[in-house]
Amino acid sequence: MMSKLGVVLTICLLPFPLTALPMDGDQPADLPALRTQDFEPERSPWFDPVKRCCSQDCRVCIPCCPY
């Protein structure tokens, strides 16, 4: 009986491998520190209001100005 169950599971899972499912690790990386708080780049000391981007320290201030 167990061997029949194994054959059925193998036949069912063979065309649909578990790697086809999207995993959390496949998601693009983002900045978790900025997600957990209300981040306002306009209040950052590096934010340039004319260009509407951050001129320095792009690790903590987004959007970053192109050089």
Swiss-Prot record:
InterPro entries (UniProt xref): 4Fe4S_Fe-S-bd, Conotoxin
UniProt GO molecular function: ion channel inhibitor activity; toxin activity
Pfam assignment, any one: Conotoxin
Tissue-by-tissue expression: Expressed by the venom duct.
Keywords on record: Cleavage on pair of basic residues, Disulfide bond, Hydroxylation, Neurotoxin, Secreted, Signal, Toxin
The keyword Disulfide bond appears for this protein: yes
S-S pairs: C53-C65, C54-C61, C58-C64
Entry domain remark: The cysteine framework is III (CC-C-C-CC). Classified in the M-2 branch, since 2 residues stand between the fourth and the fifth cysteine residues.
Descriptive protein name: Conotoxin VnMMSK-03
Organism: Conus ventricosus
Phylogenetic lineage: Eukaryota, Metazoa, Spiralia, Lophotrochozoa, Mollusca
